[in-house]
Amino acid sequence: MNALGHMVGDAEVVGLGEATHGSRDFFRMKHRVLRYLVEQKGFRAFSLELPWSSGVRVNEYVLYGKGDLDRIAREEFQGSYRIWNNQDYLDLIEWMRAYNRHHPADPVHFAGNDMGYAGPELYRRVTDHVSRTHPHLRSRVTTLYDGLAPTTDAATYLERYLELPLTEREKRAERTRKVLELLQSRRPAPGTSRQEHLWTVQHARAIHQMAKGYSYDITDEARITEMMKYRDRVMAENVAWWHKHTGDRILLSAHNTHVSYDAFDPRYPKTQGAFLRDSLGGNYVSIGFSFHSGAFKAFGTDDNVMRTYRVNAAKPGSNEHTLDRARQRDYLLDVRTAPHAVRTWLAEPRPTWNIGAGWPDPMEYRIALGKAHDILIHLNEVEATTYLGSP
């Protein structure tokens, strides 16, 4: 870990990827990295590829022990996010809770940064704040939010939301935008801290991010690409917002595709990592994972059922085939300071494992690892995480 700490240096935000969304070895390494960065480098936030509102609930548990973690995971980790309901992530969250019990004056926080869902918790926080601090706006805000907050489980809510006509989804985004702009135009009420006001505005922003994200025409491939770019921009903005308003150094956890600089996937024209580099410059560092062979959890692209999949040894000509020929089975590589011959090799795109939430994936991803990340962690073999959610 000390070698990784030296590579990270003074970076304020570290993006730590994963080559699959369901391998325990990536998650356990993230746990190790988080512990090291918290205990040795002063990091105080872990930000996951998870909706902002879900992060709010998990953070309440991490800080105060509020609620039951198993129940929170069942209720918040749904739909495409259900892969996070695994033993390795719950272990990581429990470590954060244990750390905070021993360091109540200097806690570590959990944050979501994605836009895929806005739970009832956010609507309550915004409307309660308005009722207390700007009671003359209460009727306006409750009217604009009327019928928008989820009243079912998250998966059902999202399924039904995407079945709404495009015009209705566009109208909902317009309503959430008006609430956001209404709050942005107000100063903190007397007796209200600036921080409380800013957090409420951010919660309203997260509600609008979801509504706007789902206001794109999902039957149009070009608009889907625009939505994916919007999603990565939002994820970057939420991380940058947390850093700006808390001062926390942050470990960001997401797929390699998101934390990278290079948009090697045509569906993601600009990545979260590229947006963070624009806003933070050298204060953002990207770490990617690679692996030679192994297993992972994913949901079937045909039936949406979660199961274990396995891939055999990486093919000759792939990035992993060559990376696995090093003397060490598992190792770190600082791409920025590698010998010239290595950097030249890393600058060329080659087939690479890039496994998301669903499998199989017919696409072949050609990635120039040296353009995608600052640091690589290569693992010879990985195994599937222990999934705790519904199939």
Task: List each model region and its residues.
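Structured catalytic-domain cores with a bias toward divalent-metal coordination
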Residues: M1-P391
